[in-house]
């Protein structure tokens, strides 16, 4: 049986929740501005970019998965996915064994746009990155934000955090840095052919 006894004061609870709220709002304002500037040349808004991002990492996702992992309402996920379909960046489908859910997948054009976006990422134009840079210089690494991740896990659950982590693992595996840009890694067969073709 769960104990209902409080081990914190109301003042402590209010101070913590308001501190998180104010810091999150300040961070979001900066994040939103930088995100919009990054994707603006591609005629996308933040929800559309987020949907493309999730569809890429899922290799096909249901609208409800997009809503859950994009932290948006189902109708928002559907409406922005429809706009992406009209732009030729997504395709809609139903699965033979699941006629109730609508699934989306990146089209070739959608993946091209996402890859170009990755290539145009410029950390010098990102305020949060620049704000964290002195910490990296001091400690040799960026903040891991473990406490924040724990809070998010407790709110949204393990599934959410697994997808969150998978997305970043995919970036580590799928992309390499070339000439100061992130580019998609060549498939293994192509890499092997290049190794065979290179004189050595």
UniProtKB/Swiss-Prot annotation:
Residues 13-157 form the HTH marR-type domain. It holds the Pfam family MarR. SMART domains: HTH_MARR. Coiled coil: none annotated. Residues 63-86 bind DNA. Keywords: DNA-binding, Repressor, Sporulation, Transcription, Transcription regulation. GO terms for biological process: negative regulation of DNA-templated transcription; response to stress; sporulation resulting in formation of a cellular spore. GO terms for molecular function: DNA binding; DNA-binding transcription factor activity. InterPro entries: HTH_MarR-typ, HTH_tscrpt_reg_Hpr, MarR/SlyA-like, Tscrpt_reg_MarR-type_CS, WH-like_DNA-bd_sf, WH_DNA-bd_sf. SUPFAM superfamilies: Winged helix' DNA-binding domain (SSF46785). Homodimer. NCBIfam families: PRK13777.1 (NF010349). Negative regulator of protease production and sporulation. This is HTH-type transcriptional regulator Hpr. It comes from Geobacillus thermodenitrificans (strain NG80-2).
């Amino acid at each position: 049986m769960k104990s209902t006894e409080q081990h914190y004061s109301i003042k402590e609870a209010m101070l913590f929740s308001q501190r998180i709220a104010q810091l999150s709002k300040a961070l979001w304002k900066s994040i939103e501005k930088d995100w919009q500037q990054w994707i603006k040349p591609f005629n996308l808004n933040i929800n559309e970019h987020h949907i493309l991002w999730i569809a890429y990492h899922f290799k096909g996702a249901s609208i409800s998965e997009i809503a859950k992992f994009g932290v948006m309402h189902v109708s928002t996920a559907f409406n922005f996915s429809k706009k992406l379909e009209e732009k030729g960046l997504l395709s809609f489908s139903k699965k033979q064994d699941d006629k109730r859910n609508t699934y989306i997948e990146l089209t070739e054009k959608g993946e091209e746009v996402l890859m170009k976006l990755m290539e145009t990422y410029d950390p010098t134009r990102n305020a949060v990155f620049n704000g964290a840079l002195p910490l990296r210089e001091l400690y040799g690494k960026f903040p891991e934000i473990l406490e924040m991740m724990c809070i998010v896990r407790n709110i949204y659950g393990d599934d959410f955090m697994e997808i969150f982590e998978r997305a970043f693992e995919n970036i580590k595996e799928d992309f390499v840095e070339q000439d100061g840009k992130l580019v998609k890694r060549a498939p293994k067969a192509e890499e092997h052919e290049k190794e065979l073709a290179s004189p050595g």
